[in-house]
From Swiss-Prot:
The keyword Lipid metabolism applies. It catalyses: a 1-acyl-sn-glycero-3-phosphocholine + H2O = sn-glycerol 3-phosphocholine + a fatty acid + H(+); a 1,2-diacyl-sn-glycero-3-phosphocholine + 2 H2O = sn-glycerol 3-phosphocholine + 2 a carboxylate + 2 H(+). Residues 1-49, 125-1679 are cytoplasmic. This is Lysophospholipase NTE1. Positively regulated by SEC14. Inhibited by organophosphorus esters in the order phenyl saligenin phosphate (PSP) > phenyldipentyl phosphinate (PDPP) = diisopropyl fluorophosphate (DFP) > and paraoxon (PXN). GO terms for biological process: phosphatidylcholine catabolic process; regulation of phospholipid biosynthetic process. It is a multi-pass membrane protein. The modification Phosphothreonine is found at T803. A nucleoside 3',5'-cyclic phosphate 2 binds at residues 943-1074. Present with 521 molecules/cell in log phase SD medium. Residues 261-274, 788-800 have a biased composition (Basic and acidic residues). Residues 1-21, 261-304, 498-527, 586-672, 775-800, 855-882 are annotated as: Disordered. A motif (GXGXXG) lies at residues 1377-1382.
């Protein structure tokens, strides 16, 4: 169209141009050509567009045409086909069939039906009826387990599982990684470490014995430390001038002098005619003791100690007659050379060197070191000579005197020792006295635990230890005046003495004097008794001349008035005993005439006045110290026998020459009236008889403790020490240059290393002398100081807390307030052996016997008294001990000295020989006062070290204190046995590495596994067998938690065996008893030597394949065999769980099962620590407190009730032998909680058990597996019913973040209100029939809350069950196999429930595994009765068995119906979902082993345990074939015993074993066998056929195991009369059930009537009464 327009326009333009003039023709032509070109282009474009549009239209028209045609054709032909197939063809077929007839045979129809039924059944069986086949175990590699977890800590957790091996008798491959990775704690350090790191590690390891040290204290103690290198073979003389020596590198051998003086040791303990000690009442057994052994010549037998195979030298001989030395110990790096007593001497010598000691300095050292330093060693000029000038020739030896130290150390290799000089301890004592007292307290505790406790418990040297108190009583006799004794007796006569003992305690208020004593007033004591004691204490250190004076013996009259001291005149009422008198005391006048004049002036009778005067003078001058026996005393006082001290210089005895004790100088009285101070008393400060008595008792006890006025002033002593330390002489000695003491290291006079830095210098360089001036010498500009102080903040100075009024008078007042007067009747046991010491007793009047228990059992002395009493009380027996008299103590003596020093247990019994009156200071009072007046520890250590005999000193030098951290290895299997170990505190695990014989592995690659032999708790010993037999270690010892041990070196043991053969006999009995005990339970040890003959059960031990059924989970539900956990930690997985409420129930359950138990939370610990709760000493105080609690209680429960980052939570984890992880079983997620992560990071090897808390007694199938799947560090688990009402809402609020605040509250209110109203409306409107129908219909499709049956029987308390399991007192039920005869198990279980007998663990075989599994699942008889009956009906159905028949190649049946019957009973439940612990056994015919199943789907392993050969095919499990467990052990009692069950009820329903003897000759004819069976007149028994022989052959091992189970201790064997029933008589369910019920009732009632029923812990109504409640719930004050 556009082209036409262009043409028209062109024509019009042309006509118009023609009409125009011709002049414009040229322009018109140009314009026409342009327009023509434009129109032509537009025309071309228009034509192209028109063509494309027309083409598109044509294509769409063609497509629509074909689509419409095709659809029409499809519809037409589809309709035709539909009518053809639906109408025409059926119509044609109908008409055709209506006229056609055909015939099919019956067999063809039957065959077609059979094919259809077979196909249908196969489809149904594979799709619907075989759902149980999906419940197969999932096998995952152990290394991939951690990667599949949802938590980020799974890998760390899987690594941690290696640190937590399973229990006794089980094997693990993870534990080997620990032993390989852990460094041997007693070996040398790594060779790749530098010397500096090794030096620091060894040094820090050695000073652990000091406890915690503040940084300034540590700096002052170690800033003068030196190092000394020694070549191999050099000898170091160990005397008091060295200081504290530490082996840093190399090995040193410690030697003790062997001389003939040792043969006189027997006279040391021969205490005859001792004041305060009655030796006439000793038993004749004392004379038969080791006196002959003590006289044994050690030198003559020293050659017997040398082992030819031992590389170490037994003894050495020194030249020039310096003596022979016997090897005591080999000291390795990180251990100190200095003994505990020597450490105490370092502190006490520093004080005594400045005149603060009560004893002469020449007697201060317990080791005789009389060698002069100047004569013994080279001069100082030689010390500074060059090393090149040193020569090792014998000519260069110095000339030694005849006396040598008794201890020397010989360098076994090139070694380096670090030395802290004695001056450092002197400075430390002067500058930080409280820290010094803390160190002394720590060392005293170690001395008591390591030396004394080991000597008492293990070596039986109780007499040697108690000789300390004997010597103390001999050297100090402090007798009270007779009138004070009569005053005490008079007071107690008014008290009711029917109870056998009475006490008079101080009261703050006044009370009747006849019943209670008044509190002493805050006034200074009189000058009578008290001041004469001051004379004794003051004169003890004045001069040696006064020591030789004999005391003045005077007769004490029987007057009863209080001697208040000599005064100018007497006042009216002086004859009254308790009348307060006001007086002024002047200086005591020695002139008696002056006093007589005073008396006469007052008008008093001369005779009476003289009597008072003599009494006053005698009491003031002598203070009743070392007085004679009184002639005119009351009958109660005539038993007091006093004599002079046997250690006086006039009284020479054998003992004084052998073992001089400096404490005999104390208590001497030298009348020095001019030394008495002037003391005035006002009217308000009046003294009574009570106060005088208390002050006299206090001064008597302080005298025994070594405390007097001169050594109890912290200000004077500190000032004197600091002034003396700052003197030029001492500054020169303390300067950091080589002092004379530093060159006492080597007889070659080699230069010592000055410090750590100098040790790296060249040995040829000359030692540099360092001169250091004090900081006070610096005078600097004030501006400079201010600028520095502004730039850098001054560090806070460390200051110790000191008592402001630390005075001797204040000490006496505080002690007097805590003293008590007690009375004990004759025969009363005041303190029991191995019980905690009560305190310090001062005998006022009477006598006491100090005895020890002589038990027939060697281990009884090492066992806890609580355990003996608890076990004996269950059986109605009392432990009988024969008491052996050691010595007797009379009036004026003390008892309980050693146990009261640190408040530890008593080694002896203290029994009242007669009616005895004592003054008593309790342990709590002593601890409080010792902490307040800390200088007393210096005095105690000074006195104690000088009372030790040479034998105890030898033990102290040789015994080694070993500290192990958690997971640290003590020694490994195959190491040389160099000592015996005694566990002082903590817990150890004993592992043994065994090789697995596997035919698939090559000889070069031998698989090994670690078998746990047992665990060692406090008080147990190990290593005796290896030491006695000189063999290597047969096991590896790993610390479960932080532990302390005492090591008895092999050389010391051999030396003691020669000196004391009784020690060898004692240890031999102990080893024999251990071996016999191990052989009684060979399954616990796995020792092949313990297998008896014909014991086929022991030849089939469990292997690791038996536990591979649950994601390679280890056999961690096996509890400890005979292990009882001493400490238990309750730790939640996450916060918000009721830890404290759970712990309270568990502690109460422990008490109900007969265990003395205490629960510790943070409040309890803070209450005990007091003011040390938040300082640096809290850890030290805690460790001692926890060790003490383990001694007192059988079980200590640590309750982690603090946040995860608190120190108390870490302490609970570190202290637990068994850690209970609390978890809410209903929690939707089973992720690792924050507390659990802390547990994994702590690397503890303690046993970990998971506690799943359920509100009802029901476990959802698979719930436990969800918790255990990614927790391989969990050894076992328990299901506990515990209400979580209060904590559930809290947890739900934390989990559902959106529903918080008011929205959550409104949502809950709306839901509860609407649901309640809706239910009410429905119940009103709908009839009951419709409502029930709707509810029943909806319950099938809607998940509603189920109601579970919860039994209310008391004996089924879950906390009692947990307490019995953890304490090793579990009750086990073992059900044997026997087919249909096992239905009687139901009857026996019903009888057990009727008697109220709880069941904690269930095990079974065959039908016993089925019935036991049902009972373990629900723990009630009601729901399992119907299930067992239903299963019996299915098995007895003939049609079901016929449909399960197959071609009898392997078995007669396919096992499908049997599998389905078990699966329908247990469903998807796993064994770990059972409410109580359960196991079953099976026989692995592939590996020829017995397998124990405790994890996995219940139906599979119960089916495996019931797989009777021939009837059922073996169950395939990971390539192995499992058959009935009865072929190996039809009554698995051994496994139950290994799980820690003390009482086991074993029900045997197996067929009777036919033991009829056969007689048929050497050959046998089959026809004669048939004839013999049918011959009624034949006398020959029926010969078994081949099937019977095969059956008997299969049960050979089971028969021997059954006989062994019957003879196992603690097993109650039950066998109902079911012999007449066959194995497959399941149709006789009711009959067999009633047989079991009737027999069970009769059997159990017979046990009760015959008093043979075993003790059932927790069945009694009464619980143990404890003096300390399970919780000390104190409210903590705000900080």
């Amino acid at each position: 169209m556009r082209s036409m327009n262009c043409t028209t326009n062109n024509t019009n333009n042309t006509g118009q141009n023609t009409k125009n003039s011709l002049g414009s023709s040229f322009n018109s032509s140009n314009y026409t050509s342009y327009r023509f070109q434009t129109c032509l282009t537009d025309q071309i474009i228009s034509e192209a567009q028109t063509w494309s549009l027309s083409s598109l239209f044509n294509f769409s028209w063609v497509v629509s045409y074909f689509v419409m045609g095709a659809s029409r054709m499809i519809f037409r032909y589809g309709w035709y086909l539909a009518t053809l197939s639906l109408l025409r063809i059926p119509k044609w077929i109908f008409f055709k069939l209506h006229h056609v007839q055909f015939t099919l045979s019956f067999w063809l129809i039957l065959f077609a039906l059979a094919v259809i039924v077979f196909v249908t059944y196969t489809i149904m069986k594979e799709r619907i009826l075989s759902q149980y086949k999906r419940l197969t175990p999932e096998f995952l590699p152990l290394e991939n387990t951690g990667k599949s977890g949802s938590s980020a800590n799974i890998n760390a957790a899987s690594t941690q599982s290696a640190n937590a091996p399973p229990a006794i008798g089980s094997s693990t491959t993870g534990a080997s990684s620990i032993i390989d990775s852990k460094k041997h704690s007693l070996k040398d350090g790594n060779e790749n470490e530098t010397f500096l790191s090794s030096y620091l590690d060894q040094f820090l390891s050695a000073i652990k014995i000091f406890g915690y040290l503040e940084k300034p204290v540590f700096h002052d103690l170690t800033k003068n430390m030196k190092t000394q290198k020694m070549d191999e073979g050099e000898i170091l003389l160990l005397d008091s001038t060295i200081g504290f020596a530490i082996v840093v590198e190399g090995t040193l051998q410690l030697y003790h002098e062997v001389d003939h003086s040792d043969k006189d040791h027997g006279d040391e303990t021969d205490h005859s005619d001792t004041d305060g000690l009655d030796d006439q009442d000793r038993d004749e057994e004392d004379e038969e003791e080791d006196d002959d052994i003590d006289n044994y010549d050690t030198k003559s037998c020293s050659s017997n100690l040398i082992d030819e195979e031992d590389e170490s030298v037994g003894y050495i001989h020194l030249k020039n007659g310096l003596g022979n030395f016997q090897l005591l110990n080999t000291v390795k790096p990180g251990n100190p050379l200095t003994s505990l007593v020597s450490i105490l001497n370092l502190f006490t010598h520093s004080m005594s060197s400045y005149g603060n000691s009560n004893f002469p300095s020449e007697l201060s050292s317990p080791i005789d070191t009389t060698v002069s330093v100047n004569n013994m060693f080279c001069s100082s000029e030689q010390n500074f000579s060059n090393t090149d000038s040193m020569t090792n020739s014998t000519n260069s030896f110095p000339t030694f005197p005849s006396s040598m130290p008794k201890l020397v150390a010989r360098a076994a290799t090139d070694c380096t020792i670090g030395i802290i000089p004695p001056q450092s301890f002197a400075k430390l004592t002067a500058k930080y006295p409280r820290s010094a007292s803390h160190i002394i307290q720590m060392v005293l505790t170690k001395l008591y635990h390591v030396t004394f406790q080991t000597a008492h418990d293990y070596l039986g040297l109780t007499k040697e230890i108690m000789d300390i108190e004997v010597l103390l009583n001999k050297s100090i006799v402090y007798e009270l005046p007779y009138y004070l004794k009569e005053a005490v007796i008079r007071k107690f006569k008014t008290v009711d003495k029917s109870s056998g003992s009475a006490d008079l305690e101080p009261k703050p208020k006044n009370s009747n004097a006849s019943s209670k004593l008044k509190k002493p007033p805050k006034a200074k004591p009189s000058d009578g008794i008290i001041q004469s004691l001051k004379i004794a204490n003051a004169n003890a250190n004045t001069s040696s001349n006064s020591l030789s004076l004999k005391p003045e013996f005077t007769h004490h009259p029987s007057s009863r008035h209080v001697v208040l001291g000599s005064r100018d005149q007497f006042n009216p009422g002086d004859l009254l005993s308790n009348v307060p008198l006001s007086r002024t005391m002047d200086i005591l006048s020695p002139n008696p005439i002056h006093n007589n004049n005073r008396n006469k002036s007052n008008g008093i009778n001369t005779s009476t006045s003289n009597q008072h005067k003599r009494s006053s003078r005698s009491s003031s001058n002598n203070a009743s110290v070392h007085s004679k026996k009184f002639s005119s005393l009351s009958p109660e006082l005539r038993n007091a026998q006093l004599s002079t001290s046997p250690l006086s210089l006039d009284n020479t005895s054998v003992h004084d020459h052998i073992h001089p004790s400096p404490v005999h100088l104390k208590g001497r009285v030298s009348p020095r009236p001019n030394l008495l101070p002037t003391t005035s008393f006002s009217a308000a400060q009046e003294e009574t008889e009570d106060s005088a008595l208390r002050m006299a008792l206090v001064e008597a006890m302080l005298t025994y403790l070594g405390v007097n006025k001169s050594n109890m002033s912290v200000s004077s002593s500190s000032i004197a020490n600091m002034s003396s330390l700052n003197s030029p002489q001492l500054n020169e000695m303390y300067s950091r240059r080589p002092s004379n003491a530093s060159f006492l290291m080597s007889p070659h006079c080699t230069p010592s290393d000055i410090s750590v830095a100098s040790s790296f210098a060249s040995p040829q360089t000359q030692p540099t002398m360092l001169r250091i001036l004090p900081k006070e010498y610096t005078i600097s500009n004030k501006r400079h100081n201010k600028s520095k102080s502004q730039d850098k903040k001054k560090p806070r100075a460390y200051k110790e807390e000191l008592t402001p009024n630390l005075d001797f008078e204040d000490v006496k007042k505080d002690f007097a307030q805590g003293i008590q007067l007690k009375f004990f009747k004759k025969g009363t046991t005041i303190v029991e052996q191995n019980a905690r010491g009560k305190g310090l007793f001062y005998i006022i009047s009477g006598k006491v016997n100090v005895t020890t228990n002589s038990s027939s059992s060697v281990v009884s002395s090492m066992s806890k008294p609580e355990q003996v009493s608890a076990q004996s009380s269950h059986k109605g027996e009392n432990p009988h001990h024969t008491q052996h008299l050691l010595y007797s103590v009379g009036s004026g003596g003390i008892v309980g000295y050693l146990s009261s020093l640190i408040g530890y247990k008593s080694f002896v019994n203290i029994v009242a020989k007669s009616d005895v009156y004592v003054g008593f200071l309790s342990s709590a009072t002593l601890e409080r006062l010792f902490d307040k007046y800390f200088l007393i520890y210096l005095r105690i250590s000074d006195s104690l070290t000088k009372l030790l005999s040479s034998r105890l000193l030898k033990l102290d030098h040789a015994l080694e204190w070993v500290h192990l951290r958690a997971s640290e290895t003590l020694f490994s299997q195959g190491d040389s046995a160099n000592g015996i170990y005694v566990v002082l505190n903590g817990r150890l695990r004993q592992l043994q590495q065994q090789s697995l014989s596997n035919s698939n592995t090559s000889s070069e690659e031998v698989e090994t596994q670690n078998i746990i032999l047992g665990e060692l708790a406090q008080g147990e010993s190990f290593g005796e067998v290896e030491v006695l037999t000189a063999m290597n270690r047969y096991s590896t010892i790993v610390a479960v938690r932080d532990s302390e041990l005492a090591r008895i070196p092999r050389t010391l043991f051999e030396l003691l065996a020669l000196e004391h053969p009784s020690i060898m006999i004692r240890v031999s009995r102990l080893v024999a008893k251990k071996i016999v005990g191990d052989r009684t339970v060979p399954a616990l040890t796995g020792d092949p030597l313990s297998i008896k003959e014909n014991d086929f059960t022991s030849l089939i031990p469990p292997t690791k394949a038996s536990y591979s059924s649950s994601l390679s989970h280890k056999p961690q539900n096996i509890t400890s065999g005979t292990i009882t956990f001493r400490t238990i930690t309750i730790l939640p997985i996450t916060s918000g769980l009721p830890v404290e409420a759970f712990a309270m129930k568990l502690v109460q359950a422990f008490k109900q099962v007969g265990r003395t138990t205490i629960g510790l939370n943070q409040r309890t610990t803070l209450t005990h620590l007091g003011r040390h709760a938040f300082d640096r000493l809290s850890k030290l105080k805690q460790s001692g407190y926890f060790a003490e609690l383990e001694e007192m209680y059988q079980t200590v429960v640590y309750i982690s009730d603090t946040p995860v980052k608190s120190n108390w939570t870490r302490t609970c984890i570190a202290q637990g032998d068994c850690i209970l992880l609390l978890a809410d079983a209903r929690s939707p997620s089973a992720e690792i909680g924050e507390y659990e992560k802390l547990l994994l990071n702590s690397k503890t090897t303690a046993r970990t058990e998971l506690i799943l808390l359920h509100p009802e007694r029901y476990v959802e199938p698979g719930l436990t597996h969800k918790w255990l799947r990614y927790r391989p560090w969990v050894h076992s688990h328990h299901h506990i019913q515990f209400s979580l009402t209060g904590t559930t809402l809290m947890n739900e609020g934390k989990m559902h973040v959106l529903n918080n605040g008011a929205l959550a509250l409104m949502d809950k209110l709306i839901q509860t209100e609407f649901s309640r109203k809706t239910q009410q409306n429905i119940s009103k409107l709908l009839p009951d029939s419709i409502k029930n129908t709707v509810e029943n219909f909806s319950s099938r499709f809607m998940k509603s809350k189920r109601q579970y049956y919860t039994p209310v029987h008391r004996h089924k308390n879950d906390f009692l069950r947990l307490a019995r399991i953890l304490s090793g007192q579990a009750i086990g039920l073992v059900l044997g196999g026997g087919g249909a005869r096992g239905i009687s198990h139901l009857g026996v279980i019903q009888a057990i429930e009727e008697q109220g007998i709880p069941v904690d663990v269930i095990g079974g075989t065959s039908i016993g595994s089925f019935v036991g599994g049902l009972y373990a699942k629900d723990y009630d008889l009601v729901p399992i009765y119907g299930r067992v009956k239903k299963f019996a009906g299915r098995i007895s159905s003939i049609w079901r068995m016929l449909t399960d028949l197959t071609w009898p190649v392997t078995s007669y049946t396919t096992g499908h119906e049997f599998n389905r019957g078990i699966w329908k009973t247990f469903g998807d439940t796993r064994i770990e979902d059972f409410w109580i612990q359960y196991y079953c056994n099976s026989t692995n015919i592939t590996d020829s082993v017995q397998e124990i199943h405790s994890f996995g789907y219940a139906w599979r392993y119960i089916r495996a345990s019931m797989s009777l050969a021939g009837l059922l095919p073996p169950l395939e499990e990971n390539g192995s074939m499992l058959l009935d467990g009865g072929y190996v052990d039809n009554l698995p009692v051994t496994e139950m015993r290994a799980r820690g069950c003390q009482t086991i009820f074993a029900v045997d329903v197996g067929s009777a074993d036919d033991r009829t003897p056969m007689e048929y000759g050497d050959s046998l004819n089959g026809f004669w066998i048939i004839f013999n069976r049918w011959n009624p007149f034949s006398s020959h028994p029926n010969i078994p056929n081949m099937a019977e022989i095969q059956v008997r052959l299969g049960y050979v091992a089971s028969v021997n195991a059954l006989e062994k189970a019957k003879n196992t201790p603690g097993v109650v064997y039950v066998r109902p009369p079911i012999e007449e029933y066959a194995t497959l008589d399941f149709s006789k369910f009711e009959e067999i059930y009633h047989v079991g019920v009737d027999y069970g009732r009769i059997f159990l009632q017979g046990l009760i009537d015959d008093d043979k029923m075993p003790y059932i812990p927790g069945s009694q109504e009464t619980t143990l009464n404890s003096q300390v409640p399970e919780f000390l719930l104190h409210r903590r004050n705000s900080i």
